Amino acid sequence: MQTIAPLWLWATFGVIVLASLFIDFVVLRKQGSQDIGVKEALNWSLVWIALSFLFNGLFWWAIKDTTGSTELANTKSLEFLTGYLIEKSLAVDNIFVFLLIFTYFAVPSHFQKRVLMIGIIGAIVLRTVMILVGGWLLAEFHWILYLFGAFLVLTGLKMWWAAGKEPNLDDNPALKLLRKLIPVSKDYDGENFWTMENGKKVATPLFMVICLIALTDVIFAVDSIPAIFAITNDPFIVLTSNVFAILGLRAMYFLLASVASKFHLLNYGLAVILIFIGTKMCLIDVYKIPVHFSLGVV
């Protein structure tokens, strides 16, 4: 796997992510059981977006300083921005699935914050592994791009056909399997994932929520990661754009949860994006669609 990013930029990225997670954890502890209002969620969302743009500025400077090419720095910076916006767009659909899960299990809002925090950490670890493996596969087997492209087109078509239909968690095969394998209590026991019931250790509904959130992220990662590989093969750009989009997921959830009903055309828009990106991947050896055009579509 080849990357244009210097080693010190990788290290800087790691420090920023760890510091961001620490700050988010401190804020979570300070808030306690207090609900997050729309204004606070908006402020934090703007903070995470600003941090992403600042990092992109640092990335642009690092490439220009390393290569001496302003044109190359502009191109790579644009690739980061496009990947970031793709991930942000797909994260909106992810958030609405989270909302569906929280509503189904009647999860109190102050419990939701902890679940989302765990979900963000899990998503960063999972996506780091998937991106590094995906980058290696693409470097060794170029034809995998065509598989990714076809998969995204099919996913986009499926999303278009399913748009407007209300999902039913009662019919979810993963939830049915979990309930068969793991005994679950009827009530919550604070923020505990396990509790004692009739002398036996059983899972709480919060544990089921964590499992479904993790499964949801796996499913969405399979969509979003190939989509960004359509923009660039550089694992650094794919990873950083993904992670910076994920860091603001908790604030973004509380910002959008209150206006979820207004996004009734969202899935149609996301379907178009996935179909376009999948087509771009399938045509990559025939015609290379410019990055700025991809950014415009997103």
State each model region's role.
Residues 1-298:
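Multi-pass alpha-helical transmembrane bundle typical of ion/small-solute transporters
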